[in-house]
Amino acid sequence: MAWLIHSEALGGFHFNDRRYADDDLTIGSIDPYQVFRIFAEIHAAEADGLKLDVAYMIDQSHNLKGKMEAMVQTVATAQELFLKAALIDWTQLAGLREKCEIVAAEEVFRGAFWLDVRPLVAEWRAARGLPVEPLTALLESGYVERITKERAGRQAGGGGSYA
């Protein structure tokens, strides 16, 4: 990731987690730290003055889990991990790296990962008129039940999802 960024070859990034199936898991369900590190590389490059135009794409195909619920989970997780990576203290981290204080540098990095940013993300959503709890809002909207009924005939021979 860092090599692609610094080679100015990163055009986009596909989000999914596919350890046990092809694109069937929501982002970060297996290794959220990996996604955090990817976002950290993007933030680091931008902090270094690189102008990135990254296309973020979600590449998932859920067969057992509801597609809408999984998409909302993925977007919410991506928002949280992106914010965590944005909160890394790059100045402190650079100073520790320069002094070769590897353990302390890693703790700065890990400290940002372990921050509970859900209240900040909720505040950001509320300020934009978005549901503070998007998954709850989706489930309470009745949309999933409605679309499931509308599409029931189309998936007579298919998997466990409604779309």
Which role fits each region the language model picked out?
Residues 1-163:
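Histidine-acidic metal/acid-base catalytic patches
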